[in-house]
Amino acid sequence: MVDLTRSLFAPRRGDRPTVAVLGLGRFGSGVALELMESDCHVLGVDADPGAVQALNGRLTHVVRADSTAEEAMRQLSVHEMDHVVVAIGGDLADSILTVSLMRRFGTHQLWAKANDDRHGEILRQLGVEHVVHPERDMGRRVAHLVSTSFQDFVEVEPGLAMVRAT
């Protein structure tokens, strides 16, 4: 069997960034499609055949696989990606197991979606550098836009935000 993923996704100096998005629900597919627009090589992985089919032909490569399975992730060269986004929201155990596997791989640029504060705390304890709370963060953003004259509001970190005022 020929391993095409190695030639497609192995990071190369001066080449476009390689990103694996593990979990292709609403959040993961949004991230993956935006990364494609940003000229990244994107490998999308999900266990749901419907999610994979929906993105077929829209990402550099999209595969049906279990992101908690070490051998499957190695065959897809996920351990060689520049960035990995764990976008699994529906199954807390799968999210944690996938993050744990990525940490064992030594993934340096690891992003993970948290469903709630407890999930986020577990992800931070596992060493995730970038924990994303999409619902909470968007709720805060909308609240600031509704209650002020800001045209846009992006919280960079607690106590620090970028705003565009009218």
PLM regions and their residue ranges:
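Cytosolic regulatory regions of ion transport systems
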Residues: 1-166
